[in-house]
């Protein structure tokens, strides 16, 4: 069985954030195939990201959808996992996954991801501390 994670974010490609996520996935299981849906979602634009995922979910292989578009990244908001007939969707609990989930028939179960063993610490982590060019633009 193919192990596939389809990945979308608003990270952009100008820093190492996408590479860090893909590297962590690869360290956990080097046999996982990662499909990049988009990393050019406008920063923190949940509506845009949600519409993009709704359209994409119809064409990408079943498996895992990992999506990150979150104005509160690094906050106390917990990431969630949603089990569907299509597979599992992982992302912030901010509505980003709602349209994609509805498109594939709705949620069977949803869980807050709270196991600290699977969460990258914020201190010194590129995903939380490295400014991107869009953050530095005047």
Predicted regions and their residues:
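N-terminal beta1-alpha1 ligand-phosphate binding loop
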Residues: 6-16
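Short, glycine/acidic-enriched loop or turn micro-motifs at the edges of active sites
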Residues: 13, 73, 135
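Single conserved hydrophobic/aromatic residue that forms the stacking wall/gate
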Residues: 128, 133-138
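Active-site histidine-anchored catalytic micro-motif
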Residues: 3-4, 28, 33-34, 40-49, ...
